[in-house]
Amino acid sequence: MPTVSEAWQNASKLIDRFEAKLLLASCLGVTRTYLITHDKDALTESVLNHYKKCVQERAKGVPVPYILGKQEFYGRPFKVTPAVLIPRPDTETIVEFVLAQCPIDSELSVLDMGTGSGCIAITLALENSNLNVNATDVSPAALEIAETNAKNLGADIHFYCGSWFEAIPDSLRYDIIVSNPPYIHREDEHLKNLGYEPIGALTDGFDGLTHIDHIIKNAPSFLKKNGLLAFEHGWDQGESVRTLFKKHSLWKDIQTIQDLGGNDRVTAARLA
């Protein structure tokens, strides 16, 4: 049997060196530091076979988080499967923005629309225990993952299944509505690199603004006065989203927030 060092070095001929180590550490159930301190240890046959399978999947293009079954977001491990998008660091921008709008001692109601893995809703609930968080998704499979993550991480969230506001009882009103909707343009060249993720969570099949426009149009019926509506969007969509808010005329305090890379990432407004 090959040693720890030999195994990841052989794998790095097929996949990225860092990913080769990450996958091996996962197969062994250890940290990457362990790979250094135990580099001469021989692998068992079962671990080697499992590792080879993981490497083969990665070599075919399967994203590492889907192979591992998890992805870290805001310092917490979230279960992921191909039923949900892989949480990305850029999405922490909208979480931080919303948290900044919520005084720690204020009890506010929050709705996360299109929750996917639940990373936004769960993080908001855990970072501010005074928030009453609801979340929706049109996909039952995605909601199952989100509910599992909420249970595993200890977040108290009520989930609704359905398409956007159709999922929400008409009687509910929120202080904040947040969404990371499918916003990628159907002709965006990056879509071809995201083939393993659910296409319906990536793009609306048009210009990427269809769902954003729909939510802006219908959100006033589900927001309290002065309520906040915030979207994550593409780096080049800030101006377009601001224009959509202005088109519907019921909004004030329209603003766009940049991510750590200096790109437009979140646009928000308050109900007038």
Stretches with model-predicted labels:
Residues T33, G75, L191-A201:
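Short glycine/proline- and charge-enriched loop/turn segments
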Residues M1-I36, K40-L43:
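Non-catalytic accessory regions of SAM-dependent methyltransferases
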Residues W235-K247:
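Short alpha-helix
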